[in-house]
Design a protein with these regions (language model features):
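Short, solvent-exposed loop/turn elements at beta->coil junctions and helix N-caps
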Residues: 13-16, 45-46, 122-127
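Acidic, metal-coordinating catalytic segment for phosphate/diphosphate chemistry
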Residues: 17-59
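Conserved Nudix-box catalytic region and its N-terminal flanking loop in Nudix hydrolases
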Residues: 10-13, 52-59, 66-105, 122, ...
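Nudix hydrolase/Nudix homology domain
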Residues: 2-6, 81-84, 95, 128-131, ...
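A short coil-to-beta-strand element that immediately follows conserved catalytic motifs
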Residues: 114-121
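Short amphipathic beta-strand and strand-loop transition segments with alternating hydrophobic
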Residues: 6-18
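Active-site-adjacent beta-strand/loop module that shapes the phosphate/pyrophosphate-binding cleft
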Residues: 31-34, 128-149
Length: 216
């Protein structure tokens, strides 16, 4: 059963970029398509490494010999939204890491599972109207053996992360339920689950149609 963290925000205060460790606030001057000079405010990470990508999220499929395919989601308190969130495991990419290396490391740390990266997305924008932060989505597979115990997490100091294994066929419904209970669902996880659910509900929209003359 999912339970909300007892953590809570005690105050918000303004923070100059010069005093911030992880994020900076900048003003952008630019010229729009009509030649008009404009400005924009942007929040940027200070930690981007050589790969040019800030973070990685680990979409994961868990295969078990006698159970349906599932995925592991993590619940943790996120101060910016003042709530417990439901997310796929994710983390920042270290300075000299590749996204795939970070994905394997972070999945192991947050869930205890050893996974294999199957595919990696291009660097995609996290919230392009507010920040230049970007990320890669690494889809991963974890293959379990019958009777294999749940592994121990390897969390960093200060991390309080609850992992939950959810059957893929139930993911969208479970996310909807958690949202009604007051959990905040991470957009990337919700979008993936909603897309999968849409395909399940409307398979006729995704049937390939042979084009006239194809293969001729």
């Amino acid at each position: 059963m999912a339970t909300k963290s007892k953590a809570r925000v005690t105050s918000f205060t303004d923070l100059p970029s010069s005093e911030a460790k992880w994020v900076k606030l900048q003003k952008i001057d630019y010229i729009d398509a009509k030649g008009v000079s404009r400005t924009w405010e942007v929040a940027s990470r200070k930690t981007r490494g050589k790969a040019g990508v800030d973070a990685v999220a680990m979409g994961n499929i868990i295969y078990h010999p006698s159970k349906p395919p599932s995925t592991i989601v993590v619940l943790q308190f996120r101060p910016p939204v003042e709530a417990t969130t439901v997310e796929w495991p994710a983390g920042l990419i270290d300075a000299n890491e590749k996204p795939e290396e970070a994905a394997v490391r972070e999945l192991y740390e947050e869930t205890g599972y050893q996974g294999k990266v199957i595919s990696t997305s291009p660097a995609v924008a996290a919230d392009p109207g507010m920040t230049n932060a970007n990320m890669c989505l690494c889809m991963m597979e974890v293959h379990l053996k019958e009777g294999e115990p749940e592994p121990e997490q390897h969390l960093d100091e200060g991390e309080d992360i609850l992992r939950i294994n959810v059957p893929l066929a139930e993911l969208y419904e479970r996310l909807e339920g958690w949202a009604k209970e007051g959990f905040v669902i991470a957009a990337k996880l919700y979008h993936w689950a909603a897309g999968v659910q849409y395909v399940m509900d409307h398979p006729e929209l995704f049937t390939k149609i042979d084009q006239p003359g194809a293969g001729a």
